[in-house]
Amino acid sequence: MLPTAWLLLGIDDLIRAMPNEGLEDGTLLHIGETGQVDVGPGWRDLEASWYMGVAAIVSSGTGVIVDEVFLGGRKSQERLRTAFGGLAVLWVGVTCDSEVARAREALRPDRVPGMAEHQVAIVHEGVVYDMTIDTSHASPESCAVTILSQMSTTT
């Protein structure tokens, strides 16, 4: 759908790139039994380096779709906005019905039950989007078409 090849980079890629010991012992990232996510010492430094790397990729001329979860709401967006400096960004908020989110979560073996419900309450707090898209009943393709049409009017 995109006119050139783009990269998809997201929070799950960052987590996979982190040292196992910081994930296993919870010192970098801890996911509670109810799905609450807490970050430990060192997370922000690694996150900042990741963001700077993504910004460098975009600065080199490669398009990137960033799949991020703003666990800190507005503060999380500000960290990413700062790293991206003057780069052109289309901020897209992705939402879905809580029942749909629970069903999708159940299909993912890497998710703790309740994680989606916990996160939906915090990830959009104070975040400013150029557009939002509800994926509850829309296909990924139709969502992509909607986003692409917005990209063509803003770039």
Summary of predicted features, one role per range:
Residues 1-49, 55:
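Conserved substrate/cofactor phosphate-moiety recognition/catalytic segment
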